[in-house]
């Protein structure tokens, strides 16, 4: 069993890369969240969308590998959104990909072991990330500023260097780049985990 862990700041290309990796038979480990779904997000594929009470119950029942709480303003009202992964048994005969922030990555590695994880940092300039956020629709400046601020706190160089095995510089939305990125990551995965192509 091996897992590619994609991490990176908001709108750095993690979801698009995950989708390309699924074409190489990677199985997405779906995180849970208590935030509302965005346009074009599908329950069970992008996230498991649950009510905040349900998420808090999973925490209290010790069902989570890792979770984070983010205080935000949603529709001009203070709210807390949770993100996290439940404890699940992974099939040792399958390839996996998961998207996590750095703290989640650290906890995931503690749970599954470093030898089973290949951590990829998706790097992208702030201006490009903001352009992508605006193009997603329903852009909210206050929420974007909160996310950028959280990213600056979360993605410190020392922690990145400690956890990251590989960095992808994702400068554009050129759809021709994504298959190339996925092909390289799949090749590295095959070599690292001694898998057949």
Regions found by a protein language model. Give the residues of each.
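Conserved phosphate-donor/acceptor-positioning beta-strand/loop module used by diverse small-molecule
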Residues: 95-102, 112-135
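Small-molecule kinase domains that catalyze NTP-dependent phosphoryl transfer to phosphate-bearing small molecules
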Residues: 138-189, 195-197
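Hydrophobic anchor at the beta1->P-loop junction of P-loop NTPases
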Residues: 6
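P-loop (Walker A) phosphate-binding loop of NTP-binding proteins
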Residues: 9
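The feature captures the helix immediately C-terminal to the Walker
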Residues: 18-19
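Walker A/P-loop
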Residues: 14-15
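Post-Walker A helix-loop "phosphate-sensing" segment adjacent to the P-loop in P-loop NTPases
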Residues: 23-30
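ATP-dependent small-molecule kinase phosphotransfer cores
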Residues: 33-96, 103
């Amino acid at each position: 069993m091996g897992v590619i862990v994609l991490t990176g700041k908001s709108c750095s290309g993690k979801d698009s890369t995950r989708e390309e990796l699924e074409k190489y038979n990677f199985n997405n480990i779906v995180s849970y969240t208590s935030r509302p779904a965005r346009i074009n997000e599908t329950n069970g594929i992008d996230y498991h969308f649950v009510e905040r009470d349900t998420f808090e119950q999973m925490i209290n029942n010790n069902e989570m590998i890792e979770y984070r709480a983010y205080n935000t303003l949603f529709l001009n009202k203070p709210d807390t959104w949770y993100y996290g992964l439940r404890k699940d048994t992974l099939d040792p005969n399958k390839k996996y990909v998961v998207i996590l922030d750095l703290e989640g990555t650290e906890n995931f590695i503690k749970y599954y072991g470093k030898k089973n994880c290949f951590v990829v940092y998706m790097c992208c300039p702030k201006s490009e990330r903001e352009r992508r956020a605006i193009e997603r629709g329903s852009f909210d400046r206050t929420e974007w500023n909160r996310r950028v601020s959280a990213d600056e706190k979360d993605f410190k160089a020392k922690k990145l260097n400690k956890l990251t095995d590989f960095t992808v510089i994702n400068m554009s939305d050129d759809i021709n780049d994504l298959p190339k990125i996925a092909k390289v990551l799949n090749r590295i995965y095959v070599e690292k985990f001694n898998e057949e192509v």
